[in-house]
Amino acid sequence: MKYLKILIIVTIFFFLLINVINCIDRKEIVQKEVKIKFKNLKSTLIKKYSESNMEKIQKHLKHILVERVADTPNHKKVREYIISQFDQLYWDIELDSFKDNTPFGEKTFTNIIVTSKFVNDDDEDDIDTKESNGNISSEPPKTLVLSAHYDSKYFKEFKFFGATDSAVPCSMLIDLAISLQSEIKKSKKKLMIIFFDGEEAFKEWSDTDSLYGSRHLANLLLDKKVITKDNEDLPISSSFYNTVEAFILLDLLGTPNPRFYMFNKKTESLFKKLSDIEDKLSLKRFISPKANKYFQNHFIGSDIQDDHIPFLNYVPTLHIIPYPFPNVWHTEKDDESCLDKNTIEDLSKIFKIFVGSYLI
């Protein structure tokens, strides 16, 4: 009996110790500040990324701009189309599939996670990176995360296509990834693109009926490790979240004259970078004349619920969403007819130059 008590006490001690260690490890990734240094793109690349690309985006929209409520046949077709657009020579594709309870019963959700590869790198989780002096760096490659949701909201009363919400953002991200493949191939940094499932509520928005995919993936990535090697070829494990420099979410894009504001002081420098790129492209007349500036250099408090929320405590987040929302939001008018080609092209150019400046 005496030994049994000792065994129980020792077991409880080790259980508590492990939990304390886990808490310490998780606290290390909370409240990160953005410290990204962007490089200036050559004029040839700026011109390349400023070329008209609406035809390519429309090609993607043709496949995505359908009713695509989570766990339906159309939804599966859209998922398969998105996956098919990423060349596996350049990208690793992971699917995060899981089941969750909804007001309409148990549903299956699938997040799509696409991550750029290094040249001749077959294993993302076992990476060697060389410094200029020839030594192997023990630092894992830094990662920029871009994201949007690919499901559409269920409405009993009408067919909802969700052009801005978020067929256009998904199409823009696919086009961006393909356009930047040559820069991605040479970059020492990683680009991760996440297509979230289950952003929309099936009935009324709540903590349990919304953000199904992002809530699941945010917790899953807490345990993800990136393995690098030191100069003695010994493995070093780092938390995935410690490698993420910023998490950017696109939503409700495509209607004319959107205005974007800063919602998060921690990513103010990223927002200002987008604003500066817009100004430079406007001066060069690479984007269309417009009534107002897209990226307004003003901070406003926001409690907008979206797929960035589950990641707030782990990585710096930048939420790119018009404020106020487009007047077609969650109506049957959020279809192809509400879209403005000039606005979509302009934003696409700005995002490409932003990401290109990060990768080089």
From Swiss-Prot:
CDD domains given for it? M28_QC_like
Q: Where in the cell is it found?
A: Secreted
Which residues are Zn(2+)-binding? D165, E200, H330
- Name the Gene3D superfamilies for this protein: Zn peptidases (3.40.630.10)
The residues that cross the membrane are: none
Task: Please list the reactions this protein catalyses.
Answer: N-terminal L-glutaminyl-[peptide] = N-terminal 5-oxo-L-prolyl-[peptide] + NH4(+)
A GO MF term: zinc ion binding
> What EC number(s) does its UniProt record assign?
2.3.2.5
Q: Which Pfam families match?
A: Peptidase_M28 (PF04389)
Specify the domain of life of the species encoding this protein. Eukaryota
Protein name (Swiss-Prot/TrEMBL): Glutaminyl-peptide cyclotransferase
Annotated organism of origin: Dictyostelium discoideum (Social amoeba)
Supply the gene name: qpct
